[in-house]
Amino acid sequence: FFPETTMKILMISNHLGVQSGVQRYVQNLLLHLDTAKYRVTLFVGQCPPDQASTAPALEAHGVEILAVPDNKKDRIRALAAHLRTHKDYDIIHYHTASKIGAPVCGMMRVLCPRAKIVVHSHIVYPPMTLTWRAAHLVYQLFADYFLGCGVAAGRFVFGDHIDAKPNFSVACNAV
């Protein structure tokens, strides 16, 4: 049972292992959220077989886990299908490290127009290409807030001057 004032959050990440900073960030953040105030759904790939899964601890804490395909195209289709039937999220927190995340951000905006979309960069991967420059504009068009695991990660995925904007913050990979 969740009270009417509970905020609904969709967290989108890559998988349930704890091999990298992204997974550790997601695990630490979600284990420290008050699940009486925040109803969290984690949309995430399965844990790689050679890693320990964070699923048991997260589920025990009250996080709902939606396990999705590892294939990128199948994952995007699954996200679209989920958002078509779950339009009531207050916040969508999308961990991203790719150009394809920009149009996915646009899809999230269309399917959940009232949600605040937080995009979170975890990558600095030169060289900068024209496609990345276009992705910067798309992210900035559709997202409400921007996080980077560092300023360089924010600039790489969201644009050269994103850190000068008031809706950008650094969120280190440890909570």
Question: What is each of the regions a protein language model found here?
Answer:
Residues 2-175:
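Membrane-interface segments of envelope glycosyltransferases acting on lipid-linked substrates or membrane lipids
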